[in-house]
């Protein structure tokens, strides 16, 4: 996979892309990152990329020219066009399902904006996806773009140590993940559940499933609305509702 980031602040990406899973993914040649300062594509001598909004108002708006030229140059000569992603509060809410969808692509391109917003022609004529990571405002699109890229890259084949790792993550199954414990079994009187020490894999799996359902019920009950609950799982929920 190839992932491009169009940004005015390329230095923001150095630590994230050069660390942890994203670094390992590059070493395994599962992904290639390119960080492009689209100011370099500005067609005026001062390399300005923003201007005042027509009709007045506060703030500055990103001009279409530098972004259009950057995208067109980066995609010239390629048959398969990338998914061009605009990260903005107006976009669709990002989910694990969307991450899985994007992980099937060969080329992603993020447009990371700043200032008051984008010229609408960027949104209408370049962008294939508008994505929001939540109902709050950030200074720019760099942090959301890195978050989305991280969630996508870890799904690529061979990136994680165990292929089952991401399948068991919260949201991958439609539920929040069950609790985890490691040694020691007794720390300051706080003990690991006996079931996990039993060696009985069937009991352990049932415990994990029940705790996953419980945690989802308590913290994100909205996720259960479309989850195909078994009769036993419905019984558990009924018991918790009556506690």
UniProtKB/Swiss-Prot annotation:
One of its GO terms (biological process) is tRNA N1-guanine methylation. The keyword Isomerase does not apply. Keywords: Cytoplasm, Methyltransferase, S-adenosyl-L-methionine, Transferase, tRNA processing. It is found in: Cytoplasm. Its EC number is 2.1.1.228. GO terms for cellular component: cytosol. It is an enzyme of class 2 (transferase). It catalyses: guanosine(37) in tRNA + S-adenosyl-L-methionine = N(1)-methylguanosine(37) in tRNA + S-adenosyl-L-homocysteine + H(+). It holds the Pfam family tRNA_m1G_MT. S-adenosyl-L-methionine binds at residues 113, 133-138. Signal peptide: none annotated. GO terms for molecular function: tRNA (guanine(37)-N1)-methyltransferase activity. HAMAP family: TrmD. PANTHER family: TRNA (GUANINE-N(1)-)-METHYLTRANSFERASE (PTHR46417:SF1). Homodimer. Belongs to the RNA methyltransferase TrmD family. Specifically methylates guanosine-37 in various tRNAs. This is tRNA (guanine-N(1)-)-methyltransferase.
